[in-house]
Regions:
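Soluble "head" domains of membrane/secretory-pathway proteins
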Residues: 2-126
């Protein structure tokens, strides 16, 4: 997802029917009628917090070298810390500033996801 997926890029994803998403998987989901591509950062049973140090999963500050923006809470978003319920995942956009993700809408039910991204084909320069 970095650099960000842009209009015209082709996203190829596997229609995942399993419940085996793992942290760092990039998935496709639908939110308010819009397709989103988001990274799974926590799965069922994980505790998620966002502190002054950044993203914290199960008490450990996450090292995210591929993320160039600090992960921050949204003022009108979900309350932290939170524990991801069974059958759900917590997702974040790689472009953290202004991303609509689990900080806004909470955990995502796996049954509401469309699949796991396999590759992105950049078509902007074709």
């Amino acid at each position: 997802m970095a650099p960000a997926i842009k209009d015209g890029d082709l996203v190829i994803f596997y229609r995942y029917t399993s419940t085996d998403y793992l942290p760092q998987d990039v998935i496709v989901l639908e939110y308010e009628g819009q397709l989103q591509v988001r990274r799974v950062v926590a799965t069922a049973g994980d505790t998620v917090d966002i502190t002054g140090e950044g993203l914290v999963i199960n008490g450990a500050v996450q090292q995210e070298p591929e993320i160039f923006q600090k992960t921050e809470r949204y003022q009108n978003g979900v309350s932290f810390p939170l524990t991801v319920p069974e059958g759900q995942v917590f997702v974040l956009g790689d472009s953290r500033i202004g991303a609509t993700d689990s900080r806004i809408y909470g955990c995502v039910k796996i049954e509401d996801t469309l699949g796991k991204v396999m590759t992105v084909i950049r078509r902007r320069s074709i």
